[in-house]
Amino acid sequence: VNFTGFTEKDFETFTIDGLEDRMEAIRERIQPKFKEIGQILTDDLSASLQKEMFLHIAKHARRTINPPKDTWLAIADNKRGYKQHPHFQVGLFDDHLFVWLAYIYELPNKEEMAGNFLENLNTISKLVPDDYYVSLDHTKKDAKPITEIDLKGALERFRDVKKAEFLIGRHIPANDELLRDGEKLLAYIRETFHTLIPLYKMSYH
């Protein structure tokens, strides 16, 4: 793998003004890296889950004026799209890299999935290490450490509020040395996904 990690310049993409210019930088700087690690991570998840997984790279196609504040790759068990399915994500905001298992508001059966999680709250608390984060809105940066969140409350909200979301995983600050070491970073992302696989499976039963 030639993947060398993410640089300061990659994160500076989100300071570029204008939709066209920022999108061009995303396509040139970040998306080639997403393609590279995305395929490795997709193959890895397909093998671990024993089902075919598919790589999606955010196109930001619906945007007409405002440039994206973040960008990501997503891995789901559906070839056409990922937003209506539980999916794994790796992406960048201007100040951190995120590694998520994501359940976003477009999921058609999120009540059922939330119910499965609520029945397994203790298991989830045991499975998920203390350095993990939870986000309730994928468009915002303000994720909280799992140790500081009311998990039951978050999952009930995810179940009951149409727009509510549930993302769980890890954050790496943009200045962290780990991001400059492609091999170590890839191992870290894989380890995070592997930790979250039991939750992914839980959402289907």
Model regions and ranges:
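Charge-rich, low-complexity N-terminal segments
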Residues: 1-98
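A general structural signal for short secondary-structure junctions and capping/turn motifs
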Residues: 64, 91, 124-126, 157-159
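Long, solvent-exposed, polar/charged low-complexity segments
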Residues: 1-46, 140-205
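Short, hydrophobic/aromatic alpha-helical segments in well-folded domains
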Residues: 76, 86, 120, 192-195, ...
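Compact, glycine/acidic-enriched structural inserts
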Residues: 97-153
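Intrinsically disordered, low-complexity regulatory segments enriched in Ser/Thr/Pro
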Residues: 79-115, 163-167, 171-175, 180
